[in-house]
Amino acid sequence: MREYAVFTSESVSEGHPDKMADQISDAILDAILKEDPYARVACETLVKTGAVVLAGEITTTANIDVEAVVRQTVNGIGYHHSDLGFDGSTCAVINMIGKQSPEIAQGVDRQKPEDQGAGDQGLMFGYASRETDVLMPAPISYAHRLMERQAELRRSGALPWLRPDAKSQVTFAYENGKPVRLDAVVLSTQHDPEITQTQLKEAVIEEIIKPIIPAEMFHAATKFHINPTGMFVIGGPVGDCGLTGRKIIVDTYGGMARHGGGAFSGKDPSKVDRSAAYAGRYVAKNIVAAGLADKCEIQVSYAIGVAEPTSISINTFGTAKVSDELIIQLVREHFDLRPFGITRMLNLIQPMYKQTAAYGHFGREGSDTAFTWEKTDKVEALKDAAGL
């Protein structure tokens, strides 16, 4: 497979309307899981001028104040005043959530938890590479960090004219499959009307971009496109409608790896769209961290109501130190990829999903209760089994 000469990935801020929708959906999921760990949740959100619309299917014993969760989330993102075009305290909240079909439940639920079937058919991918210290592709990793930096400076008041909505796009040049220089950065950020474009561009380059991207990656021809359309005062849900699940490439690997098509936010762990994609990252990251390959993509697939994956495939892009067949064998031996096995292996029945809903689901610090799929606790077992 020919390597890319350049590669580009984008990210968006927590104040981007699609990410607002993701965070609201996951905040509702978290609130439900706090009271009912085994709830079935599929929560979709739409945000547009003055309104948040909720829809989906939820089956739970939890009794939560959905409207309060929505308002707290919107205000927490930074849309807390009408001057910003959206106010979490006064926006309309329209709730159209129903119950999950019993036909789905009968296909998923089992007497023995380990026999729990997949919540739907589908295919999911996981990926890892040695491009960065978090074993993620460089373009998406740095695009996320730029958006985190924008939010940090906005929240701290260091750049008080910043507003919540923003986007980044990063292009790296590659040689021999490794990023060697920064070709271009695009960064658009919502702002107060008083700031001049000259002030904004200087601040974005000096305070957001340069502290994040390593100095050695810049070169004389690096291009900076800062708010290239000029003014960006009208943003968030006023500028664009936001929907849950519309940033699936931002959420994963920035286009560097394939995607099965299923979104994450608003879905409980019984939905393999989410849990199996997390497991795929866990598997791929441990394979790369163990030195079995420098780059790894895994595909898993499921049938609704069936526990065992219908397929497991591995692609190491010619970087493996052992055969791909052996790696697949080790995956089957060391990782339980049944839906219940994934939930248990990664401790997924936790109210921790809202923090995944902005700045990427992968390549972030792992802990006992969040981003557990970033752990590399299978490394020694894989090394020993592979004879490395």
Curated annotation (Swiss-Prot):
Its organism's taxonomic lineage begins at: Bacteria, Pseudomonadati, Pseudomonadota, Gammaproteobacteria, Moraxellales
Give the similarity note: Belongs to the AdoMet synthase family.
Main location per the UniProt record: cytoplasm
Which source organism? Acinetobacter baumannii (strain ATCC 17978 / DSM 105126 / CIP 53.77 / LMG 1025 / NCDC KC755 / 5377)
Pathway it acts in? Amino-acid biosynthesis; S-adenosyl-L-methionine biosynthesis; S-adenosyl-L-methionine from L-methionine: step 1/1
Region of interest (Flexible loop), ranges: 100-110
Q: What NCBIfam families does its record include?
A: metK
Q: Where does K(+) bind?
A: E44
Provide the protein name. Answer: S-adenosylmethionine synthase
| InterPro entries hit by this protein | ADOMET_SYNTHASE_CS, S-AdoMet_synt_C, S-AdoMet_synt_central, S-AdoMet_synt_N, S-AdoMet_synthetase, S-AdoMet_synthetase_sfam
Gene Ontology cellular component list: cytoplasm
Q: Which GO terms describe its molecular function?
A: ATP binding; magnesium ion binding; methionine adenosyltransferase activity
Enzyme Commission number = 2.5.1.6
Residues at which L-methionine binds: E57, Q100, D240, K271
Bilayer-spanning residue ranges: none
Give the binding site residues for ATP. Answer: H16, D165, A166, K167, D240, R246, K247, A263, K267
Record bears the keyword Transferase: yes
Provide the cofactor note recorded for this chain's UniProt entry.
Binds 2 divalent ions per subunit.
Cellular localisation? Cytoplasm
GO biological process entries: one-carbon metabolic process; S-adenosylmethionine biosynthetic process
Which residues does the annotation say bind Mg(2+)?
D18
Q: Which UniProt keywords apply?
A: ATP-binding, Cytoplasm, Magnesium, Metal-binding, Nucleotide-binding, One-carbon metabolism, Potassium, Transferase
- Assembly information from the UniProt record: Homotetramer; dimer of dimers.
Q: Which residues form a coiled coil?
A: none
Q: Which reaction does it catalyse?
A: L-methionine + ATP + H2O = S-adenosyl-L-methionine + phosphate + diphosphate
Q: Which cofactor does it need?
A: Mg(2+); K(+)
HAMAP family referenced in this protein's UniProt entry, alphabetically: S_AdoMet_synth1
